[in-house]
Amino acid sequence: MIIFALIFGAIAIFTSFIYIEKVLPRLLCTFISGVILVGSIGGIVGNYYDHFGMHKVTETTIQKIYSADTTGKMNMILFQPIGTAGKENVYIFTRHENAKKVSHTKANEYTSNKITLTKGSEATLKTTKVRWQYKSNAYKFWFGIANNNNKLIKRTNRFYIPKNWFVLSTQQAKELKKKMSSSSFQAKAKEEAAAYVESKIKAAIVQDPSLMTDKNRQKKLTQQLAAEYQAKLLKETVSKIK
């Protein structure tokens, strides 16, 4: 609407100055038209540069997120450095359990990302967005043609990640996958896992002889120890590629 006021003011000031013969009415109409014209220009400039008629609105959302490993074998969040300086990262994760497609944060001048390690068991993403919004419908009516309502100023993504998760670059993840996929690594891991479980089972039987004849407990303990070794091996392998 402000554009129409600007056009009206320009036409009115021209018409008043040229076509109204009587001095007093001409001056009065020219003055009023000038106020409309200058006011419109001032409003447009103020809205464009200083967001006249607008205020900042903050919106915060919190959601549970899941591992970037869609196979479900590892709990991890990945990051990809962007820009030549490498000071900012795009983070990769999944938004739903058992999701086959990963999500990632935006890569633009409005977005910043932060990682906080927690003692909790769930990973969450807290997103805070700051936008420009019109203070009232009246301001929106006058300046809405600029299409700047709800314009994003800043987006902050804060990831709260459990300490037992891995935070890896995409390059590190590729190296890890390559290493763990090698036949020599898998053969060695299988051998070491068997030895680890066997030694722990023997130690448990020494402490509790009844375990020797309890096959169900042995099976459960074996599965627990195998998972324990897997986690230990994974942690050691990741530490070597960092």
Regions found by a protein language model. Name each.
Residues T94-K242:
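Extracytosolic and intramembrane catalytic regions of membrane-associated proteins
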Residues I65-F93:
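Short extracytoplasmic
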Residues I18, K22-P25, Y49, G53:
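Juxtamembrane transmembrane-helix termini
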Residues G46-G72:
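Alpha-helical transmembrane signal-anchor/signal-peptide segments
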Residues P25-S33:
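Membrane-interfacial entry segments at the cytosolic side of transmembrane helices
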Residues M1-V23, G42:
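Membrane-embedded alpha-helical segments of integral membrane proteins
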Residues S33-G53:
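Transmembrane alpha-helices and immediately adjacent membrane-cytoplasm interface residues
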